[in-house]
A protein has these predicted regions:
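Alpha-helical linker/hinge and terminal dimerization helices associated
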Residues: 65, 94-106
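Short loop/turn motifs at secondary-structure junctions and domain boundaries
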Residues: 7, 73-74
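N-terminal amphipathic/basic helix or basic patch
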Residues: 8-11, 93
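N-terminal helix-turn-helix DNA-binding core of bacterial DNA-binding proteins
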Residues: 11-54, 75, 81
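Basic, amphipathic "hinge/linker" alpha-helix immediately C-terminal to the N-terminal HTH DNA-binding motif
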Residues: 74-97
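Basic amphipathic alpha-helical segments that dock to polyanions
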Residues: 55, 59-62
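A short, conserved structural fragment
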Residues: 63-71
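Recognition helices and adjacent regulatory flanks at domain boundaries
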Residues: 1-9, 46
């Protein structure tokens, strides 16, 4: 897990956005929250426009921050599954509110 001791945050929102900010992290977390365990390829198909490099980076960061769990199965072909950790599950109400806000305001675009 990343060490945030050296970094001082002005407020808790800044810390939260450090962990889940950006274009892809909230969407990855949303799909894992709604669909449960997903394999890498399944996540990639859900995120139209994301590159392999970006998805790999985002998954590694979410895992390092303790928000998702990566389960690797040593078999042929290799199998890796991603799921929310207990800490990651605490973000579900926030993601649900973001979804609700988006549904209410998307039609105005």
């Amino acid at each position: 897990m990343k060490s945030f001791i050296a970094k001082q945050y002005a407020c808790p929102v800044e810390y939260t956005l450090t962990l889940i900010g950006g274009k892809w992290k909230p969407v990855i977390l949303w799909h894992l929250a709604n669909d449960g365990i997903k394999r890498y390829g399944e996540i990639k198909k859900l995120l139209i426009g994301i590159t392999h490099k970006m998805l790999s980076q985002q998954l590694k960061e979410l895992e390092a921050d303790g928000l998702i769990h990566r389960e690797e199965y040593h078999q042929i072909p290799p199998k890796v599954e991603y799921s929310l950790t207990d800490k990651g599950k605490t973000l579900i109400p926030i993601l649900q509110l973001m979804c609700q806000w988006g549904q209410e305001n998307m039609e105005h675009i």
